[in-house]
């Protein structure tokens, strides 16, 4: 992305309060939903097949809310990538589970943070990486113009990105052996030959085995991280939950 254009967007997003970022995000989500039939059909199929909702009214509400939350995720992502660290941290209103992190750090075996695509997942790494070293495994996007934006946006504080290839896995292992933390998005489809088929809500899902292998090899503590959205414009609550070794021993757990 052209530096002048990038600087313009940084300036623009610095002027937009979180309330309007999320409000515009809801609108973007609905526009995207209208024009992207593949994503729309996938969302409807997934929520229908989950069988969580007992009637069509509840299902329709869930679909509409999901559309809005997806839009928020997109706009929040850009806002986080383009904003200063201090501004992003001001959006964090509460943090739960810091005792688990402290205990994990005292074990000196490293931490594997699992951050699924729920809520504002971008803010969890910015929060931890503002205090301690964090190596984040990430899959470069197909859109080339996004690569530098994501690298600059996520590598704030003590954060470092590692690609999803052999060199990236080596970076992850090196960080864990130094008793540092790493971040992994566990709900991405694994590369061919690097996953295991498991049943998820009655559907087959090809799930990564990297986390269970890393935990077994290094003895690292595994902690789930989640950025919960509070009321619109009110910021986020970050949750850290330590997982048992049995839970992460296999994707089937």
Feature map (PLM): residue ranges:
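Membrane-anchoring hydrophobic helices of lipid-metabolizing enzymes
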Residues: 1-115, 149-151, 156-158
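Soluble catalytic domains of membrane acyltransferases
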Residues: 81-253
